UniProtKB/Swiss-Prot annotation:
Database matches in SUPFAM superfamilies: Ribonuclease H-like
Any Pfam family matching the protein: RVT_connect
GO MF, one example: aspartic-type endopeptidase activity
Function: During replicative cycle of retroviruses, the reverse-transcribed viral DNA is integrated into the host chromosome by the viral integrase enzyme. RNase H activity is associated with the reverse transcriptase.
GO biological process entries: DNA integration; DNA recombination; proteolysis; symbiont-mediated suppression of host gene expression
Protein name per UniProt: Pol polyprotein
UniProt-listed Gene3D superfamilies: 3.30.70.270, Ribonuclease H-like superfamily/Ribonuclease H (3.30.420.10)
């Protein structure tokens, strides 16, 4: 907010959602008393997909539990997954960080 005050001009932010969807969400979940001006732009297909994801796992479909880590000094690590049906895979990683 300090940068906005220093420059003396508030930017108009682009929100990739339809106005009606945003206003409904804002009415239910608002947490601040002030937000800058918004321009509502067309929603990319991947963002529409995100909002249509299911909340619970589908019956008889694999649920993947994913994890990974690496050693900070050697930069060697492992990443993998396991499903509720026991299918699993682990890969060794070299020259990596925990951010990748």
């Amino acid at each position: 907010k300090e940068a906005l005050v220093i420059w003396g001009e508030l930017p108009t932010l682009e929100l990739p959602v339809e106005r009606e969807v945003w206003e409904q969400w804002w009415a239910d979940y608002w947490q601040v008393s002030w937000i800058p001006e918004w321009d509502f732009v067309s929603t990319p297909p991947w963002l529409k997909l995100w909002y249509t994801l299911t909340k619970e796992p589908l019956a008889k479909e694999d649920v993947y539990y994913v994890d990974g880590a690496c050693n900070r000094n050697s930069r060697e690590g492992k990443a993998g997954y396991i499903t509720q049906y026991g299918k699993q895979r682990v890969e060794k990683l070299e020259n990596t960080t925990n951010q990748q």
